[in-house]
């Protein structure tokens, strides 16, 4: 496909407040995943992946355990998924995924992020068609052809594979996440995955420069401050 996938990982939270927000987001997501699919990670693969991801992001064990206990204890909040789409400052496409126990509040909070930065919130489907919902795996390596052949031998469906600066990136349909991960583990038992996630990969990028770049960063910062926002996907290409 000739796409260049840039993984933008936020640096480790530098303030206690930022860390608490990360813990809260993971706690909410783990709670809902366990409540809907069961609290046993061996029986709920989505939960198993989520817990693994939380540990990689240095979420403390007590935060994870509390979310699991809450899910098995009955009662508790009933969060719903909410997705908002639109165009960020500079015209970049954006998808905002939330978990909320009050849809009206969340919509107003997210809407203010758009309004105060000159962005435009749209209707469902406004931006989603500009992304591919994919499973992405990234790890160190130098022979993408060998990896592709190994995955094909395991009957894993791969849509693209790239090699850049000693890093291999594998793209697959989002429904193939666990199959591809299992195939990689079978073929390369000692492989360390630097990235393993289901995400929205932009089909193309929109350059965002100058004042728009400043507004775009403010837009992201405001969304990050929203307690109900879980993930933000965009296709902005910012200057270094």
Swiss-Prot record:
The lineage of its organism: Bacteria, Pseudomonadati, Pseudomonadota, Gammaproteobacteria, Vibrionales. Pfam families: TACO1_YebC_N (PF20772), Transcrip_reg (PF01709). The keyword DNA-binding applies. Keywords: Cytoplasm, DNA-binding, Transcription, Transcription regulation. Its main location: cytoplasm. This is Probable transcriptional regulatory protein VF_A0150. Belongs to the TACO1 family. GO terms for biological process: regulation of DNA-templated transcription. GO terms for molecular function: DNA binding. It comes from the Bacteria. It comes from Aliivibrio fischeri (strain ATCC 700601 / ES114) (Vibrio fischeri). Disulfide bonds: none annotated. SUPFAM superfamilies: YebC-like (SSF75625). One of its GO terms (cellular component) is cytosol. It is found in: Cytoplasm.
């Amino acid at each position: 496909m000739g796409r260049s996938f840039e993984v933008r990982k936020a640096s480790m939270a530098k303030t206690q407040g930022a860390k608490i927000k990360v813990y809260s987001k993971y706690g909410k997501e783990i709670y809902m995943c366990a409540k809907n699919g069961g609290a046993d990670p061996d029986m709920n693969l989505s939960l198993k992946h989520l817990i693994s991801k939380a540990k990689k992001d240095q979420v403390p064990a007590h935060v994870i355990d509390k979310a699991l206990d809450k899910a098995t204890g009955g009662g508790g909040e009933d969060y719903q998924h909410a997705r908002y789409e639109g165009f960020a400052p500079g015209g970049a496409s954006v998808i905002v995924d939330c978990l909320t126990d009050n849809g009206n509040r969340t919509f107003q909070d997210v809407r203010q992020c758009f309004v105060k930065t000159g962005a435009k919130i749209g209707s469902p489907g406004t931006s989603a068609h500009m992304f591919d919902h994919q499973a992405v795996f990234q790890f160190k390596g130098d022979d993408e052809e060998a990896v592709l052949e190994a995955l094909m031998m395991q009957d894993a469906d791969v849509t693209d594979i790239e090699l850049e600066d000693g890093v291999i990136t594998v793209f697959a349909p989002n429904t193939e996440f666990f199959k591809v991960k299992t195939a990689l583990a079978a073929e390369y038992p000692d492989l360390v995955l630097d990235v393993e996630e289901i995400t929205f990969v932009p089909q193309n990028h929109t350059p965002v420069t100058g004042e728009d770049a400043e507004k775009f960063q403010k837009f992201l910062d405001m969304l990050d401050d929203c307690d109900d926002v879980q993930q933000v996907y965009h296709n902005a290409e910012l200057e270094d």
